[in-house]
Amino acid sequence: PRVLWKNSEFKAYLVMLTAATALITWNLMDGMDFSGTQAFRYAAFQVASISSTTGFVSNDFDVWPSFSKLLIILLMFIGGCAGSTSGGIKVTRFVLLFKMVYSLVWQKLHPQMLAHVKMNGQEMPENVLYSVARFFFVYIMLCVLWAFLMICDGVPALAAIGVSVSTMG
């Protein structure tokens, strides 16, 4: 158990799932008039199902408020942890990308300082970071391209984005 709490990916995944569940619960209580327990149950199940890309559904989230649907699409986009069979970009890549951007911003603010990106105490080589950035860019561009093509074909924007992200994942 202690090793898990030192793992950057696990902590980020836990924060992501907790925040998404809390935000969707709040949004369902506010926008759909669900009770607190009912909203939490639907939100927690859908967040777990979508982030692991298992595809199970406990409620028709197509009728949920747009904010909840947007969070669900974001969870589809991110996906699960490294080594899992879930789709998406993976949490590890998001953590590395975030740390890379943070490091670049920090270096711009303090040019004399050398900022290294570390993951679980290990310094990440520059070629790994650039490979993650390239993968992220290509993934985003393909999602945007597929969504754009579907929008041109008359599919509503949010539906096109959802289909594009779920197909890519």
What annotation goes with each model-predicted range?
Residues P1-G169:
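Membrane-proximal intracellular helices of multi-pass ion channels
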